[in-house]
């Protein structure tokens, strides 16, 4: 007599695992041609939406919701691009951009912000020898993709 609940993963699990592995290997094959981008914004909905737009535009997009999480992700993801909000708690986007430039000098960086008053942050970065391209939020998806592509051509 068996007490409690029992279940079997059986064929459904095996088929699901095989599909997952096949999708992952297909993604690895595509990734060589697709640029990788890390989207960083503490506004989760905006970060998620931006990443979805960029995925549809041909980028492999990952999301971080703060600067520290972004730095951790970069160690394994190695993005070609970093798109980060400027005004975030703990580590602002300019600080993240500077740290990224020092650790991953080939990563192309674009800042975006919907808040006034970021000029002081950007000026401090400039004094330290770092200058970054800035897009104003809200930004039309086509302008975002266009800006990133022009950044990639530099």
Label every model-predicted segment.
Residues 48-56:
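Charged docking surfaces used in two-component/phosphorelay signaling
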Residues 58-65, 73, 135:
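Short hydrophobic/Thr-rich beta-strand motif most characteristic of the beta2 strand and flanking loop
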Residues 65-69, 92-96:
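Acidic catalytic/metal-coordinating carboxylates
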Residues 75-77, 100-107, 127-129:
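Conserved phosphotransfer cores of two-component systems
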């Amino acid at each position: 007599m068996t007490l409690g609940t029992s279940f079997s993963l059986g064929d459904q699990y095996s088929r699901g695992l095989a599909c997952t592995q096949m999708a992952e290997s297909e993604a690895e094959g595509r990734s060589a041609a697709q640029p990788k981008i890390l989207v960083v914004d503490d506004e989760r909905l905006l970060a998620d939406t931006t990443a979805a737009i960029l995925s549809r535009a041909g980028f492999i997009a990952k999301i971080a919701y703060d600067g520290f999480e972004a730095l951790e992700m970069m160690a394994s993801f190695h993005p070609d691009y970093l798109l980060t909000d400027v005004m975030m708690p703990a580590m602002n986007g300019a600080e993240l951009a500077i740290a990224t430039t020092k650790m991953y000098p080939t990563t192309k960086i674009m800042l975006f912000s919907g808040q006034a008053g970021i000029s002081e942050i950007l000026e401090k970065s400039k004094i330290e020898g770092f200058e970054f391209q800035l897009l104003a939020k809200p930004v039309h998806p086509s302008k975002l993709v266009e800006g990133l592509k022009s950044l990639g051509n530099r």
